[in-house]
Every structure is written in structure tokens, then in C-alpha cells.
């Protein structure tokens, strides 16, 4: 099984290490990349279509930092490649990257929508962020 995601927790800033790790995964093929970090209790994320190099440039413009972070290079299976569908998917309390297919995502999405959760993307992964928050 191969992975396209990275997670690092440290007592030092992790953004650069996550980007460097994502660059090592580029050979696997992907259509978008993203990163989320936790700093002072707040989740910050940056996502983009295209290469990790473009993500790195976007990060420089946002000054995203944190001692905990996740990242993913994504090959779309649900939802077209777009910034909205790119990973990570976050709620106020959790950020998720996922490689695979959530078979019952449609059912879970309907249950969560009845509880008042709003979905931004066309992906199955966003369900996890809301489900964990619930």
C-alpha cells in the first residue's frame, strides 16, 4: 500500500518539513496538494491545484505555521480537482486527509446534513471532518 499523506507533530515549526515530505511523494502522481497546521488552538490550511511547488508559494503568502501539521498530495477519486475539493478538509476542531474511498459517504452526508452540517466540497473525505466533530 502506498501513501500520499504526511503528518508531523513536534515542539518546532513543521510547515517546511511537511512540504519537503510532500515533495518526496510527487513521483506517485497527483493533481493537487494541501497542508493544515495547528497553531495556538487554530487550524490553518492552504490548498491548491497542481504541484507542491505552487502550494509552497501559496504558503509563503499566508505565513501558515504550527507545531502540528498534516499534508496530502491528492489524486481525485471523488470530486474534480479544485481548491474546494483539495485536501485537507477541516472543521473548527479537526482537519483530515484521506487516501481511499469511503463507501458509505453518501449516507453519512445525508445524516450530517439533517443535523445542520454544511458541505463545501464534492469529496467523500469531508464527511470524516464533520463526523468526528459531531
What are these regions (language model features)?
Residues 1:
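Active-site loops and adjacent core secondary-structure elements that bind or stabilize anionic groups
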Residues 4-134:
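Conserved short alpha-helical segments that host acidic/polar catalytic motifs at enzyme active sites
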Amino acid at each position: 500500500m502506498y501513501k500520499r499523506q504526511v503528518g508531523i507533530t513536534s515542539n518546532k515549526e513543521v510547515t517546511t518539513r511537511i512540504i519537503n515530505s510532500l515533495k518526496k511523494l510527487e513521483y506517485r502522481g497527483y493533481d493537487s496538494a494541501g497542508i493544515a497546521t495547528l497553531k495556538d488552538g487554530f487550524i490553518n490550511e492552504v490548498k491548491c491545484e497542481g504541484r507542491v511547488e505552487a502550494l509552497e508559494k501559496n504558503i509563503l503568502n499566508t505565513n501558515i505555521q504550527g507545531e502540528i501539521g498534516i499534508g496530502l498530495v491528492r489524486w481525485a477519486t471523488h470530486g474534480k480537482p479544485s481548491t474546494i475539493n483539495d485536501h485537507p478538509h477541516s472543521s473548527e476542531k479537526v482537519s483530515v486527509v484521506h487516501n481511499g474511498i469511503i463507501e458509505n459517504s453518501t449516507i453519512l452526508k445525508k445524516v450530517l446534513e439533517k443535523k445542520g452540517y454544511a458541505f463545501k466540497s464534492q469529496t467523500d473525505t469531508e464527511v470524516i471532518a464533520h463526523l468526528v466533530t459531531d
